[in-house]
């Protein structure tokens, strides 16, 4: 069994929305944070909130060699300047029973400069596709002022209650201790709903660990696709992902916050770095390694049910829909580059497993 999978909440839209809200001033008072967390918040707003595309569509355009939102060149076309950086993310060529094919890639939603230029195999898969399929197109939402205004309202309690009334004393205490490592006081978060607190902490963790959501693989490919005029297919939507976060029960967030017990800023950064290292080598199974009995110590039977519910909603239920979307696209003969989070492909109940059970074959791409 797997404990509640906090790292699965680190998908692009959560960080993007928190970053936009930071830029709008809708985050805890910066006086409650130390210099490092102030810097992280500022960086998040600067690098993630202004996700724009540049250049005109070109029939010869291709994936750029490195993500740079400041580029204003009239074309996104580049050379195939591939460096040897050891980045070999998991990628498959999937073939349907009827013989149609699709290239599928496992993404990591926040990356570092060292990941670019992309490996040639990834560049080729993008350039050869007519359609880029992603979880959701966050670049279109970042400029929607009305959407962000409504989202900001949902961050806050509007019934005169506060965070401490919605989670247990144990969860509150664990969260308070963990916030201390970030130089934050929990009192600054009392008016925020649990999903907003969680997303804010995720964003701080991403930035303080040296990652950049704007350089995340999906965001980079989306920006490039818009510049190239390439068709984009949303497997889900921003609304779907945000509603998923917003509608998780207080019990789920209570368990999530209790999981901070014994954690520090450094331990969380190391956990994220371990996942990143696994992603770079194409080791997707690391994302879903089972916890041993020692790691599950302290989990009641009710906790295990809550964790299972969360993991099903965040991962396995979505995997089914993602696999179905891939099958639909292949049945239409679409030439698609299919890019969703790496964890969605892993293990039993992952996209590859589901496709193989439906008679599809999946061949791992070798770099």
Ranges and model annotations:
Residues 2-4, 89-90, 118-120, 323-324:
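A generic local structural motif
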Residues 31-32, 38, 60, 71-77, ...:
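Phosphate-group recognition and catalysis centered on beta-loop-alpha active-site segments
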Residues 52-94:
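N-terminal low-complexity, Pro/Thr/Ser-rich intrinsically disordered segments
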């Amino acid at each position: 069994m797997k404990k509640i999978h906090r790292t699965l909440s680190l998908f692009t839209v959560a960080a993007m929305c928190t970053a936009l809200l930071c830029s709008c001033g809708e985050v805890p008072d910066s006086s409650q944070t130390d210099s490092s967390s102030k810097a992280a918040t500022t960086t998040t707003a600067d690098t993630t909130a202004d996700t724009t595309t540049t250049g005109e569509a070109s029939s010869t355009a291709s994936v750029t060699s490195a993500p740079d939102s400041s580029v204003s060149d009239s074309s996104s076309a580049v050379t195939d300047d591939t460096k040897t950086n050891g980045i070999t993310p998991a990628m498959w060529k999937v073939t349907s029973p009827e013989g149609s094919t699709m290239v599928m890639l496992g993404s990591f939603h926040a990356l570092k400069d060292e990941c670019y230029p992309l490996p040639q195999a990834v560049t080729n898969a993008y350039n050869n596709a007519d359609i880029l399929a992603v979880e959701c197109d966050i670049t279109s939402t970042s400029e929607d002022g009305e959407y962000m205004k409504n989202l900001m309202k949902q961050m806050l309690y509007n019934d005169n209650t506060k965070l401490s009334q919605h989670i247990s004393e144990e969860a509150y205490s664990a969260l308070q201790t963990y916030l201390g490592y970030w130089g934050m006081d929990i009192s600054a978060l009392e008016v925020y709903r649990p999903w907003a607190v969680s997303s804010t902490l995720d964003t701080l963790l991403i930035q303080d660990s040296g990652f950049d959501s704007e350089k995340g693989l999906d965001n980079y490919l989306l920006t490039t696709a818009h510049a190239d005029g390439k068709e984009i297919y949303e497997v889900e939507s921003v609304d779907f992902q945000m509603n998923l976060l917003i509608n998780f029960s207080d019990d789920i967030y209570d368990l999530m916050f209790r999981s901070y017990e014994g954690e520090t800023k450094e331990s969380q950064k190391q956990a994220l770095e371990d996942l990143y290292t696994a992603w770079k080598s194409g080791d997707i199974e690391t994302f879903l390694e089972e916890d041993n009995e020692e790691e599950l110590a302290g989990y009641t039977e009710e906790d295990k049910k809550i964790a299972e519910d969360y993991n099903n909603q965040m991962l396995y239920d979505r995997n089914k829909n993602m696999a179905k979307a891939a099958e639909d696209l292949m049945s239409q003969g679409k030439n698609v580059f299919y890019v969703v989070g790496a964890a969605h492909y892993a293990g039993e109940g992952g996209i590859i497993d589901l496709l193989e059970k439906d008679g599809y074959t999946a061949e791992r791409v070798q770099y």
